């Protein structure tokens, strides 16, 4: 899913669009999503299970990947955990913005 005329929007506007899409998917599957970061270079998201029957974290990450048309990073199939044991995924977004950097989402569940 890409916003219309994505080449005419800023990176921050694209991240805002991606955040809304991720929150919609998360809500449908028992999660709440919060931003932790500035949304200037990447989009740092935390997904928190909100109901007892929330889907598996990797399933949620795969749903985000699909809705955004993103690509898996090299560690996608390796279980990477944060210091506190949360699962971590990086979604490479298939867009290039004028400043030449590829946007991505760092997702912690």
Where are these regions (language model features)?
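Preference for bulky hydrophobic residues occupying beta-strand positions
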Residues: 45-47, 95, 107
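N-terminal, Lys/Arg- and Ser/Thr-rich interaction peptides
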Residues: 1-5, 32
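Active-site nucleotide-donor binding segment shared across nucleotidyl transfer reactions
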Residues: 18-60
């Amino acid at each position: 899913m890409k916003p219309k005329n994505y080449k005419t929007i800023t990176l921050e506007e694209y991240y805002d669009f991606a955040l809304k899409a991720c929150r919609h998917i998360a809500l449908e599957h028992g999660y709440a999503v919060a931003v932790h970061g500035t949304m200037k270079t990447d989009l740092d998201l935390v997904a928190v299970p909100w109901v007892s029957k929330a889907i598996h974290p990797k399933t949620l990450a795969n749903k985000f990947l699909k809705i955004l048309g993103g690509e898996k990073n090299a560690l996608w199939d390796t279980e990477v955990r944060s210091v506190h044991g949360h699962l971590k995924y990086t979604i490479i977004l298939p867009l290039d913005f004028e400043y030449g950097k590829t946007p991505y989402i760092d997702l912690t569940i």
